[in-house]
């Protein structure tokens, strides 16, 4: 049983990436994180949401991105879910400089960033059926 849950869904517009960061940061705030911890979470969420918009929906603004977050004791689990084109080869996509959009001036898909800032990263994807990225972080909660 979780201590708290939330979910939000928004259209795949790049402007909504900032909304996603703030919404998740507000939810995680109940764990009394440090500034660095909250920035880590915001950065990881930003990377995952940006991937959904740019790579999953190829910048189409008619897709939906869903975020589900859950707090269990001192850990937050955040799932970023899209129904975009999916990832052909997850292992290749997780390489630091790999991108499915070499036409854009970006340096990879951000999975290395997510791994750096979070305690756990799981990616589940099916070509043509979308992607689910799950990130987790533990906090030093003082009782």
From Swiss-Prot:
Tell me the enzyme class: transferase
Keywords, A to Z, come to: ATP-binding, Kinase, Nucleotide-binding, Serine/threonine-protein kinase, Sporulation, Transferase
| Single GO MF descriptor | protein serine/threonine kinase activity
UniProt-listed InterPro entries:
Anti-sigma-factor_SerPK, Anti-sigma_F, HATPase_C_sf
So what does this one do? Binds to sigma F and blocks its ability to form an RNA polymerase holoenzyme (E-sigma F). Phosphorylates SpoIIAA on a serine residue. This phosphorylation may enable SpoIIAA to act as an anti-anti-sigma factor that counteracts SpoIIAB and thus releases sigma F from inhibition.
Q: Which HAMAP family match?
A: Anti_sigma_F
- This protein is called Anti-sigma F factor
Q: Which organism is it from?
A: Clostridium beijerinckii (strain ATCC 51743 / NCIMB 8052)
The gene that this protein is the product of is: spoIIAB
